[in-house]
């Protein structure tokens, strides 16, 4: 398994956790999960061959969704946060 696949799997599992727990978890827990997703994205995007990776589009979609979700979490809009996460998961699946 390559580094990009590992980063994608870490991001995807983190986003699935977030999608299922936007309403029932503490803000700090959600921030930690989003931080883990963004750290995996940074690690993947720093790779030399990221531009040629088949995981480039899904990783980018999940990173964009995580960034938008973070903004909504900071504003206290958890339902919009969940919608962004689900949209990112949908985009990454294509």
Task: Spell out what each predicted region is.
Residues 3, 29, 54-61:
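A generic short alpha-helical patch detector that favors 3-5-residue windows
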Residues 1-27, 31-34, 89-93:
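Short terminal alpha-helical segments
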Residues 8-11, 15, 34, 38-41, ...:
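Generic L/I/V-rich hydrophobic alpha-helical segments across diverse proteins
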Residues 21-27, 46-54, 72-80:
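Charged, low-complexity interaction regions
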């Amino acid at each position: 398994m390559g580094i990009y696949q590992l980063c994608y799997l870490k991001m995807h599992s983190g986003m699935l956790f977030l999608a299922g727990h936007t309403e029932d978890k503490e803000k700090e827990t959600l921030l930690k999960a989003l931080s883990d997703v963004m750290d995996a994205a940074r690690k993947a995007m720093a790779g030399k061959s990221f531009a040629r990776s088949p995981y480039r589009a899904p990783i980018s979609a999940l990173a964009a969704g995580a960034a938008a979700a973070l903004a909504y979490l900071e504003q206290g809009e958890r339902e919009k946060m969940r919608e962004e996460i689900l949209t990112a998961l949908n985009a990454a699946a294509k």
